[in-house]
């Protein structure tokens, strides 16, 4: 327990120190909301990636879709990297940076208002952004409660309070620049953490090949299998899984959304140059491949950890308990790494949501 708490304290301390350090870049509204439009490609790429992949992906989606589709759920990660990251940067990166710089727009609603010369459009879009980011933010707290309950026996409300306070402190102190630097640090933690967790889980199953063999012996689940594939052998290690059509739908749904999410598109507003966009495209795509593919690949082994703990009173699978169950037997050091990993994923997304929604509400609703 001491090791896990120590890692948390170090993590929290670093976040606050970064907020204090970044305060010097906050000289005006532009500096607070966009870091003075001088953020480098690596910081922007990591900020984009960490905003994309939160605790919802690691704890929720990885467990749910890994359970349904097995190792073929890794295709979701590939789709996220190629469509949600690479395509988004290619289509929007340079264009968004140029247009928002030219129009001096700091938020998505402000861009719409100036681009189409419509104050009504700006007002409506600001309300949409502010209102619909609230349930997304709430979902982050929900997924985190499962993991913190396993690791520390924390009460849900204390987890919410601690995260909210920490996010508020470093966002208020350093604005976008603090968020970007912390996102970079949190991204490094996520990269190291997901690799360590995958290795540990596979070793616990006797190695990669042994885990594959065990997974291949699990029979078809009629609830999550296309009717034409009910007789297939080894559905959870197959190339396209037991239900390719629905798998394709999940890939599209989880990948295309990034093209319109304000907290992610806003990263392009702040990048310092068009040249930096090219570097950011490569870095962001590679980051997405490791994190997203890693999460879904890990979730693909979820059925090896089938136990009464993952079922509700009505017999239905509680998908958000699958990943915590997989990790429950790990040593304290590794659980500490996992907690910091998920906390990093959540804090990075949460800070982006807070900054985006607050700046939109202030600049586009109250001020407008």
What feature does the model see in each segment?
Residues 1-60, 174:
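Membrane-interface "cap" regions at the ends of multi-pass membrane proteins
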Residues 15, 76-171, 250-257, 344-352:
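Helix-loop-helix module between adjacent transmembrane segments
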Residues 39-48, 113-118, 186-200, 286-288:
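Small-residue-rich segments of transmembrane alpha-helices in multi-pass membrane proteins
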Residues 67-69, 92-95, 146-150, 165-186, ...:
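Membrane-water interface regions at transmembrane-helix termini and the short interhelical loops
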